[in-house]
């Protein structure tokens, strides 16, 4: 019986510890039409928060499950996404995406859907920025 209680206690402690140590990253918008963090490496279950800005928002263009992407944020509204599925997520600012205002989220260091992300139709400027962000994402491993 004591062993069962000890095992249950350890399991509860592990669950609580995992919840407590989940990380949240905050991303702001810069005056240069970029996100303050353009490539975010996070673990499964972690959260990213985008701080409010009157001129910018967040719209996901691709992810590991193209049928289920986070909803587009409103302008000047706090926006938060918890990432439970590993893979590469591409997002942009709706009015400034064609000018290269993009960001990548790499969840669980999983690049399995990178080819799908690279095939998303973008303006030439945005495509160039995406290639730069992909290089950065791979160099941060």
Regions found by a protein language model. Give the residues of each.
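Sec-dependent signal peptide recognition
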Residues: 2-10
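Extracytoplasmic copper-binding redox domains, predominantly the cupredoxin/blue-copper superfamily
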Residues: 20-141
